[in-house]
A protein has these predicted regions:
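Compact, glycine-rich, soluble single-domain proteins
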Residues: 1-76
């Protein structure tokens, strides 16, 4: 499952990030494999996905969020 498919309000653990420059930018923000996040919202029409990590909110572009693989926290 990817971040876009996740329901708002659900928690999940990041399993895999996209490759390349996008991964470097996400990791610099603290979004790394193994980190638990909560999906706050997803804007319509391909807009950004907002997540919360360690009490901080981040907006991730829809195209990048499609490549962030997650595992729902309840299924760990």
């Amino acid at each position: 499952m990817n971040l876009v498919e996740m329901k708002s309000g659900d928690r999940a653990v990041i399993k895999m990030l996209p490759e390349g420059e996008a991964a470097q930018r996400l990791e610099a923000l603290g979004l790394r494999s193994g980190k638990e996040i909560e999906k706050i919202s997803c804007m319509p029409f391909g807009g950004p996905v907002t997540v919360m990590l360690e009490g901080r909110h981040f907006a991730v572009s829809h195209s990048i969020a499609e490549h962030i693989e997650i595992e729902k926290a309840g299924s760990l």
